[in-house]
């Protein structure tokens, strides 16, 4: 019988394609009794092109690979120092619509940043989370058979310069930000637990369990 427990995997630094394949496999294999999972991971440098992605938004990738993804949205960059959180949730079971999940993820990041003194907000016209006009977190989701995968990417203490090689999320001149511009001692190690605590709170504090990678 299904129990409302979320399994949390802290996966460290991983290549994007291997984790993407694992997400697909998990989503394809899961059934109505499978636990929901949250994966916390950082990726080696990679540009990922979303389903709606247009090639003209990849300006000069250089030595960084470009990988096609089936998440929503346009091109973005992942690299070390960016906390990625993948949400593998049975939305039907949790009575969440897609828009509800987007709002929940944005609020997770807003609440996490508020705890460390950074005022952030979502934008109606461009998904993600912003500090002033600068984008600090990107979102991209896919829903299959009522279950979500992919998730969010929060810039913590990463090198932002690769974002200059693309139009982030399809917006020319979109300025990116990272947490260490306001909070110098931020690392993925001290941000990940806050991010997890905040998403669990918004999911009504289900029991959770860390699973060894």
Swiss-Prot record:
UniProt catalytic activity: octanoyl-[ACP] + L-lysyl-[protein] = N(6)-octanoyl-L-lysyl-[protein] + holo-[ACP] + H(+)
Localization in the cell: Cytoplasm
Site (Lowers pKa of active site Cys) residue list: 135
Keyword Acyltransferase appears in the UniProt entry: yes
Pathway it works in: Protein modification; protein lipoylation via endogenous pathway; protein N(6)-(lipoyl)lysine from octanoyl-[acyl-carrier-protein]: step 1/2
HAMAP family referenced in this protein's UniProt entry, alphabetically: LipB
PANTHER family: LIPOYLTRANSFERASE 2, MITOCHONDRIAL-RELATED, OCTANOYLTRANSFERASE
Stated name of the protein: Octanoyltransferase
